[in-house]
């Protein structure tokens, strides 16, 4: 949607949240993240990176100001799927996170040339993933 467009990229929204230690994946409402707890977010948006495009992910400052720390990597050229993002409530207080809320910004980068092997050819462990995915899809 146009609401996700930013001056430098695109905001990605929360589809699911999995809180470490809780076997239930939350898909609606507001999720309370306990203090000092790791959690995982999957994105509503499905991305499809061309073989000459990668992207950086940046946690929205809204969450940083609430004490959330994000552990993100780059989205590799050739990756396709939803994203699973690791985060941590670093405060001594619970943090409330609504499903559907904007969580991070994706900033795309053009590579100087196409990759020799894109993500699907190199490992592809999470290629095509949907929802919170903690284990590789391929072995």
Predicted regions and their residues:
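DUTPase catalytic domain/fold
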Residues: 1-139
């Amino acid at each position: 949607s146009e609401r996700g467009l930013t001056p430098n990229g695109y905001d990605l929204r929360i589809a699911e949240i999995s809180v470490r230690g809780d076997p239930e994946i939350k898909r609606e409402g507001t999720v309370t993240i306990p203090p000092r707890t790791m959690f995982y977010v999957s994105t509503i948006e499905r991305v499809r990176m061309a073989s000459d495009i990668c992207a950086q992910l940046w946690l929205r400052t809204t969450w940083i100001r609430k004490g959330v720390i994000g552990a993100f990597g780059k989205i590799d050229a050739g990756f396709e799927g939803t994203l699973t993002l690791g985060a941590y409530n670093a405060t001594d207080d619970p943090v409330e996170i609504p499903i559907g809320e904007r969580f991070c910004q994706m900033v795309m980068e053009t590579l100087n040339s196409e990759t020799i092997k894109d993500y699907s050819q190199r490992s592809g462990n999470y290629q095509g993933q949907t929802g919170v995915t903690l284990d590789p899809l391929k072995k």
